[in-house]
């Protein structure tokens, strides 16, 4: 067989490991087999196209980066590939499994769909809850909880003896549950939305996997599973590798994407739109990272100790009425999680506020507490007129509950929350950072803070680039070490075989007196040993380099983390100064000068003497109602920079601004809050969309996003300048 150095095959069916040398397969996995390996099996030229006739084939699974044997009856031929792979290890004859029948169900019991398994207010299917509780009781310190290998299909889901299962069996049970669902947990439609959000990197991916994009029962189950995986990752010695490993394991289980069509070879999509085979793992990794950034505190396994003393009567000493929840300074009502994040940004541990729960169930609230530099979300439950964080619910009102934990540590509710509710974020009294009392003085100080913020941002960006580069180099070194290990293993096996054969030949040549052949055999043996020693030495040097570079990488990460609080504080101060100047009527041109932003004067409306003549006053020129992102991009296609429209957002109660920047269409969420419309706190100040549009007609969006160096200059439906003479 001559020609290419290897061949690619794609798995059509799942295959579970039967022997240590076997490969686990998922549908769509790409396998690489070297030409030398097929030659060693006696495969004639052209025989590689019929893998079912080859039998067991040795190769590399591109998804798991593992080597081993797989049945040719489970794969299809894709095409040649210019990759050199080590030859196969010798192995004895072995019967080949029959090719699964097309359309035949995977052995095992298929579970009912999720709406048939549970209903809100339950947060997840009882089977999954039972498995997760069992595995968390065994402890979350093991790094080997979840491996990428496929579990055996289950035929019994009674779980009657689950308390006797070991950790590996429980982990397989959770993976089996996901595979036993009649359809993947993440639907293809939701997967497409998540892929677009991940590709555009315009914000968190999580909202793309919430209702209505992802059906309610699937969204609840996914959220429950991510909370569990977040706890597993947070207990690992190194968070980053743990998150990547969990993504690689659960990505294919959650999406169960079918293999791409076999006509184009892998990587050969002409338009570049073919989804990456790594997308499922990357998606789960991103979701876990978002979850860990704002970790939701789960209720404890056991109910908290009862309060030391029953809360006193809520009647005031002067005979007045007890304070109501609406009057509490720390209760903010129906505000979004993003607004809460902004209010708690850069605050000390123990800072808190309460808002309405996102479930919109009457009587349920969410306490957000700052702890360890992160926001902890704690659900306030309500039943029969009583409130609490978990059973038993002993407080007569939310006010009583919060007042109790202002004096008692939350550690009695959750051991990790060893703090009290110390600093309420008051809706009546917001901190005033601006100390200067004149517009010029405030503007001068804004310039100083903005310069400090830019300097810190540049330093952080440089560190981030260095961290990304070294992380990639570390991964390449780890891959090289794995290759060294595999090469050493092959050479040592070859050495053992050679040593066994050499003894027989040496004895034979000694009897024959053939000194020349004896010397040749001994020389070959010494050369092989020398080569193995060289590879060992190279691997040792690479491991030393890896340890040194990993240490440097950790130092860069520490420096980045030390910069984050400074960046957040400087941005908060800068934003307060911008809001103060805006409220005092400072002209945007002057603000832009303080910020170092060039004032654009070339748009067609810049020279209008009377602002009342602007087409922005006519909502019909820019408000287009309920259209989606794709339709908005079509309307703005080919338009000049600054052309914009306002539409309804897919987020309930919000709007979206689509604007052309550097020839591309960008999308920004417009929030509607109690204080007004705006792109972000503390800028939600505008009483209507029209007021917002008129302000940003001359104010750059760059203050919200460094990539949006544009104003809302040209309403999409406004009459524009005439075409050039050549086009008339």
UniProtKB/Swiss-Prot annotation:
Residues 330-425, 622-716 form the SH2 domain. Residues 109-295 form the Rho-GAP domain. Keywords: Disease variant, GTPase activation, Phosphoprotein, Protein transport, Repeat, SH2 domain, SH3 domain, Stress response, Transport, Ubl conjugation. It comes from the Eukaryota. Residues 4-80 form the SH3 domain. One of its GO terms (cellular component) is nucleus. The record marks 147 as: Arginine finger. Phosphorylated in response to signaling from activated receptor-type protein kinases. Dephosphorylated by PTPRJ. Dephosphorylated at Tyr-655 by PTPN13. Phosphorylation of Tyr-655 impairs while its dephosphorylation promotes interaction with FBXL2 and SCF(FBXL2)-mediated polyubiquitination. Residues 81-117, 254-279, 295-320 are annotated as: Disordered. GO terms for biological process: B cell differentiation; cellular response to insulin stimulus; immune response; insulin receptor signaling pathway; intracellular glucose homeostasis; negative regulation of MAPK cascade; phosphatidylinositol 3-kinase/protein kinase B signal transduction; positive regulation of cell adhesion. The SH2 2 domain is required for interaction with FBXL2 and PTPN13. Regulatory subunit of phosphoinositide-3-kinase (PI3K), a kinase that phosphorylates PtdIns(4,5)P2 (Phosphatidylinositol 4,5-bisphosphate) to generate phosphatidylinositol 3,4,5-trisphosphate (PIP3). PIP3 plays a key role by recruiting PH domain-containing proteins to the membrane, including AKT1 and PDPK1, activating signaling cascades involved in cell growth, survival, proliferation, motility and morphology. This is Phosphatidylinositol 3-kinase regulatory subunit beta. It comes from Homo sapiens (Human). The gene is PIK3R2.
